[in-house]
């Protein structure tokens, strides 16, 4: 890692021995361990260990769960909120498990579209609800800091499964709950 940073500093014209940079390789290495810890965790295990049999057959919504991730194209952050709605069949998941699922997938090199899909697909596979919807809203620094440099752009993605995909009324109920 130290060789990588020495080469990086040299390529951008920095002095690797400058006081403020001496510990940078170690600090960044620790930061990267945290930012990409999702590779060391199994999202399916996180959900499997946090559900229980339930009797609820109405919509459950976890709204505005904040996340931070890294764009795999430019290695710049993107961040925002994810909302998950589901209609249980037999299993109800602990709310913190939804946040954990989001954290595991977001702590990897990502694109927003895949992040949204992975959350929905894993939730659908493990919890087997009658329907699940995931909506992700994010700001991408790769869009703000370079290229088109649009500071206020927000990208929205959604993935729908089961009743949310088949029934417009169910989808509309979820969207109304997000507004309230």
Curated annotation (Swiss-Prot):
Positions annotated to bind Zn(2+): 71, 74, 142
Any one GO CC term of the record: cytoplasm
Broadest EC class assigned to this enzyme: hydrolase
GO molecular function: GTP binding; GTP cyclohydrolase I activity; zinc ion binding
EC numbers for this chain: 3.5.4.16
Superkingdom of this protein's organism: Bacteria
Disulfide-bond pairs as recorded: none
Pathway recorded for this protein: Cofactor biosynthesis; 7,8-dihydroneopterin triphosphate biosynthesis; 7,8-dihydroneopterin triphosphate from GTP: step 1/1
Keywords linked to the UniProt accession: GTP-binding, Hydrolase, Metal-binding, Nucleotide-binding, One-carbon metabolism, Zinc
Catalyzed reactions per annotation: GTP + H2O = 7,8-dihydroneopterin 3'-triphosphate + formate + H(+)
Keyword Nucleotide-binding carried by entry: yes
GO biological process: one-carbon metabolic process; tetrahydrobiopterin biosynthetic process; tetrahydrofolate biosynthetic process
SUPFAM superfamilies listed in its UniProt record: Tetrahydrobiopterin biosynthesis enzymes-like
Subunit text: Homomer.
Similarity-based family: Belongs to the GTP cyclohydrolase I family.
UniProt name for this protein: GTP cyclohydrolase 1
Protein source organism: Helicobacter pylori (strain G27)
